[in-house]
Regions:
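Charged, often Cys/His-bearing segments associated with DNA-binding zinc-finger transcription factors
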Residues: 1-44
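Secondary-structure capping and boundary motifs in well-ordered enzyme cores
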Residues: 35, 56-64, 79, 103-106, ...
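Peripheral, non-cofactor segments flanking catalytic/redox cores
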Residues: 42-45, 69-70, 94-112
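Short, Lys/Arg-enriched N-terminal segment that forms or immediately precedes the first helix
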Residues: 43-57
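Alpha-helical support elements that line or immediately flank enzyme active sites
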Residues: 64-77
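DNA-recognition alpha helix
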Residues: 82-96
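Active-site- or DNA-interface-adjacent structural scaffold in DNA-acting proteins
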Residues: 99-167
């Protein structure tokens, strides 16, 4: 049986000494496709009118913002808090989003603010561009999209139930 080590852990560790893995194959392939097509430059060009060149605090880069939204989409995260947490937690996602090991993940409020800053048409244009590149790169088949929208009646409060036959 092993025993707990009592030695003091090192205070500084070089990033080259940190254990690394090849990363998530999907994000590696996705990143390669987006990089080859110039995604970050395209996103910056599309979003240029929403960013002031000299005013305010530094904002989230458009390429990084849309990469975060892609992570949220592919992992089923519908809240900015979940996207920010995932970016802070996963090294593969950090690599895809272009976050260095020493950089903090964007705060959920920054993601939310950026979402409100950029209009719907620009979001649609960028996601359409990404979708076309992913179909061409073989990550999406591009044949059909299924949407499930089921409407269900719900009883909000059991005390307010009224029988239909007696009114």
């Amino acid at each position: 049986m092993g025993t707990r080590k009592t030695e003091q852990p090192p205070l500084w560790v070089a990033t080259a000494d940190l254990p690394s893995s090849p990363g998530h194959p999907f994000y590696s392939k996705l990143s390669a496709i987006l990089d080859a097509e110039g995604f970050d430059r395209f996103a910056e060009d599309q979003c240029r009118r929403f960013y002031a060149p000299t005013m305010g605090r530094p904002s989230l880069e458009p390429g990084r913002y849309f990469r975060l939204l892609l992570v949220g989409y592919f992992e089923g995260l519908d809240a900015e808090r979940g996207i920010a947490w995932r970016a802070a937690d996963s090294l593969a996602v950090r690599r895809f989003v272009r976050l260095g090991i020493e950089e903090a993940a964007p705060d959920h409020s920054t993601i939310s603010r950026t979402r409100r800053l950029i209009d719907v048409d620009t979001h649609r244009a960028i996601f359409t561009w990404v979708q076309q590149r992913l179909v061409a790169g073989g990550l999406l088949k591009g044949r059909t999209i299924a949407i499930d929208a089921t409407t269900l009646e719900a009883n909000a409060a059991m005390r307010s139930i009224v029988r239909r036959d007696t009114g």
